[in-house]
């Protein structure tokens, strides 16, 4: 409990946490503000029939906003899609590659391009959803009160504005709050919907659609998956590093042994989020286009189908390696070690050290990619088999646990920086000082 008590003793940290909760509360309020021109009851009936389909999976990332067609119906996924496109383009477009190497000014420019891309993608998805809703249901089952271009344009602009506001909200959380704002928005949407998912599971048991044995089995599965995620997310490959002794006057500096910690999952929760975004973008549009071929295409990409899971695994593996290459540069690490007199025993400083770190990183990234694929795919298939909500699937659990651990680590960094105990005491030697 002392770790939580210490939070209140640091005004800046306390302010950041309050700011984070306040901004997330704004997001959750916005999820309940409906887009005008929609029959809420007809839309609810539509999503009741769509449980277990791609729409249900998309709604999980939208925090329930799509089910209500709220102003935040698109969620933060258009921003993530734009981020993916920009990060891929920085590899192949020389101008963007130069910008990415220009420090803070270059990053600000790329962020601005990402915002423009978010607006474009939001407009496309918003228009597709508006057209699709007009086609879903006729007469008494009509979802839209007054179909036509006025509704399409108004809905497109409303949903685009909602996503743009969420993008700004996420940036504010990252800058003025605690944790990664975009990840926390997805995290809060999933967590906020879990009580409803539990209630839905209970109603299935009451209706005889699911027995208690299956509920107990799913509960055990969730517990095992969470434990496994925590273990893997905190696992490291430690490379020993030795620093050479330096004699300055009568003093001896250096000579200590330490290690270079490489996380098993360096990319964090980014790969499954990026993979989901890529699959959902075309599939969501197809789901709302009233043609038989498009409906078949959308059905093929429904979570649990072979095509979806193969694509999902492929994208997860790709983004594990791609994002790790972005956030961790072996050349920079090797140069810094050489600069300060550090070396890996048995490995020559400089290029050889960089190559060695890259080999180790590639091996553990492959293990991390297999782990994420296993966690995201296998539980989802089992849960689909028993018709349980997506909020109990591997992707949702990985995001909740991963983002939670990352946020706790950031809080601990603030505490340790100011000589206080962290939230999790690692040993008796780590006691803080007031």
Where are these regions (language model features)?
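N-terminal cationic and glycine-rich segments that engage phosphates or anionic surfaces
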Residues: 1-100, 105-434
């Amino acid at each position: 409990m002392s770790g939580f008590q210490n939070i209140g003793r640091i005004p800046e940290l306390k302010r950041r946490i309050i700011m984070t909760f306040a901004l997330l509360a704004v997001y959750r309020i916005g999820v309940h503000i409906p887009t005008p021109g929609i029959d809420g009851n007809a839309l609810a009936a539509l999503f009741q029939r769509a449980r277990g389909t791609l729409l249900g999976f998309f709604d999980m990332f939208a925090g329930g906003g799509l089910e209500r067609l709220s102003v935040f119906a698109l969620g933060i996924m258009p921003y993530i899609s734009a981020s993916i496109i920009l990060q891929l383009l920085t590899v192949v477009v020389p101008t963007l590659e130069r910008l990415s190497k220009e420090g803070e000014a270059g990053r600000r420019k790329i962020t601005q391009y990402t915002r423009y891309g978010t607006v474009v993608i939001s407009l496309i998805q918003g228009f597709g959803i508006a057209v699709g809703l007009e086609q879903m249901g006729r007469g008494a089952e009509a979802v839209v009160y007054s179909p036509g271009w006025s509704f399409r344009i108004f809905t497109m602009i409303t949903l685009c504005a909602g996503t743009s506001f969420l993008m700004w909200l996420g940036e504010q959380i990252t800058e003025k709050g605690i944790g990664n704002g975009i990840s926390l928005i997805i995290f809060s949407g999933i967590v906020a919907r879990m009580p409803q998912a539990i209630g839905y599971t209970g109603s299935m048991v009451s209706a005889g659609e699911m027995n208690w044995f299956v509920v107990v089995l799913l509960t055990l599965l969730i517990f095992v998956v969470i434990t496994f995620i925590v273990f893997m997310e905190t696992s490291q490959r430690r490379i020993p590093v030795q620093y050479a002794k330096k004699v300055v006057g009568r003093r001896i500096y250096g000579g200590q042994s330490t290690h270079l910690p490489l996380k098993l999952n360096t990319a964090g929760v980014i790969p499954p989020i990026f993979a989901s975004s890529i699959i959902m973008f075309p599939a969501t549009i197809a789901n709302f286009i009233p043609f038989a071929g498009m409906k078949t295409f959308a059905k093929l990409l429904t979570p649990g189908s072979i095509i979806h899971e193969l694509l999902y695994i492929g994208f997860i593996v790709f983004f594990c390696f791609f994002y790790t290459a972005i956030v961790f540069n072996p050349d920079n690490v090797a140069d810094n070690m050489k600069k300060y007199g550090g070396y890996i025993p048995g490995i020559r400083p400089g290029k050889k050290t960089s190559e060695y770190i890259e080999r180790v990183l590639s091996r553990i990234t492959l293990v991390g990619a297999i782990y994420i694929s296993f966690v995201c795919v296998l539980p989802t298939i089992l849960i689909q088999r028993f018709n349980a909500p997506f909020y109990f699937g591997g992707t949702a659990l990985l995001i909740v646990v991963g983002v939670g651990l990352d946020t706790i680590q950031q809080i601990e960094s603030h505490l340790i920086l100011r000589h206080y105990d962290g939230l999790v005491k690692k040993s008796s030697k780590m006691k803080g000082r007031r």
